[in-house]
Amino acid sequence: MPAKVVGLFRYPVKGLSAEPQASVDLHAGRGFPGDRAFALASPTNAFDEAAPVALRKTEFLMLARQEALARLQTAFDPASGHLSVLDRTRSLTKDIRTPDGRADINAFFAEFLPDDQKGRLPRLVTAPGHCFTDVGVHSPELMHAVSMLNLASVRDVEQRIGKHLDPHRFRANVLIEGLERWVENEWLDRDIMLGAVACKGARLTRRCPATEVNPDTATRDINVPQELMICMW
């Protein structure tokens, strides 16, 4: 079976849920459209929207530390500026282009702050051309990288550990079928075609504790980074 793309996903807000995409237009140096365009900065984070600089992911709310974020279903409509958040029995939809809308979003997410920051508010932040990818701290080019996931490799790990692994744990933009398992480890500095778009393998994704979180239960149930080390070596 020839390799093919079977899933396209963007994550409008860093650390929050995925939005499936039927198709996307990729352009050199611009990353995956609409991906990680927003983030929830911690109360002590001095991120400046007028002069954005890439910061470590620990400066923002993230699944690696706040696994409860996985219970949220979010959607962003660029045309209206509306960010919708569903948390089990309660929901919120606000226009984040307005100060009041952002203030309400900030207040909603206050409960997800770590204990040492309780009583304060996170800030929903964004900046034109800025992407809140984890690897953005390494270079401007990596800030706009597109993340790809080989589903054959995911199944290989599943078989070895005897547990189901939802591919959404890995928060990739592009899901690919039809490849040999772990062939992606050979893609560094190689040209890769996504449809008519030529990409180049930049680096292997270093998996963090966010992958430990089950997207269905919002609990940590598998030490994925450790299992990957065992499977790959």
Language-model regions, residue ranges each:
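Metal-cofactor-dependent catalytic cores
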Residues: 1-233
